[in-house]
Amino acid sequence: MDADPGTPMMRQYRALKAQHPDMLLFYRMGDFYELFFDDAVAAAEALDIALTRRGKENGTDVAMCGVPVHNAETYLQRLIRRGFRVAVCEQLEDPEEAKKRKGAAKLVQRDVVRIVTPGTLVEDELLDARAPSFLAALAVEGDGDDAALAWLELASGHFRTLATTRTALAAELARLAPQELLAAESVIADPAVAQALSEWRDRLVPLEAHQLAAGAGAERLRRAYGVESLDGFGTFTAAELGAAGAVLAYVELTQKGATPGLQPLSSQTVEGRLALDPATRRNLELVEPLAGERGATLLAAVDRTRTAAGARLLVHHLTGPLTDLAAIAARHDRVEALVRDAERRRRGREVLAETPDLERALGRLGRSEEHTSELQSLSHI
């Protein structure tokens, strides 16, 4: 490969990279995704793969590394777990067809077809089936204490908001544990929320304040759901609308036009649930260990669920313990009914063991993609 900046290929690469400066660019070349320059250095170190030098630019060797297309998901998973965002650039035509053209027109047409980020994963190969994966956004209202969170699990379409306060923000973020957190640059720099955001610095995605505006958020929501009014979804604060709109805008950016399958948006409440600050959660080792193996957690000790959706629900229950006595008693009654009837419990576990991950299967069907395997799994229910 000639890496001279004047070649058509390098001009194409530079143009695509300029559009995604804060991401690694997987540039498709035949059976490999190639990375160049600083991207190559970062990826080679993160993936522990060979860093090579190929071609020159301005007399200097160009760093390069690559991963095979057929095994790309494995490498993407490792990069995402390290906190990278990756723009995947594909060949949009058969290279043999491109060769029939003359001159610079022989260059294979390429473009970024998806952006893979920690909070927008939908592929089974990249997700932990037994843990939620949230993209969240934080919005605040003026200089007061009011704030809001919105979060979406793109794989299942679960879309929620919560009106909260700056004071309670740390506890709510610890409960959600988002993979990515969108927030205005001014909010990130605000000393009043700095402590709450300190745990999530490596997951923050800074936005401009206007990207979390309530009016724009409401319009984006109406467009996404195909409605003229959001009244049927309930009542939302201005901050909730701004946060939810920012989540949708980020999804539209990363999915490159693919339509997400969204469940109805709803505003949540934390009434009846215990608020736990980050330090308390860590020390209790509810779902994450202080050190060592993941088996040293309360979740690992009590998880006997037979489905992925059940495991995610258990995480939800453990990270938001009930405080309402009536709700606790009702849960105890349900548990007692199953404990007393061993045969019903056995049959139920057998049925659940054969049940596919309905939430995420339906989420995939809701996106504008073909998923024959999802249809087949649902047909057996």
Feature-to-residue mapping (PLM):
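Cytochrome P450
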Residues: 175, 346-352
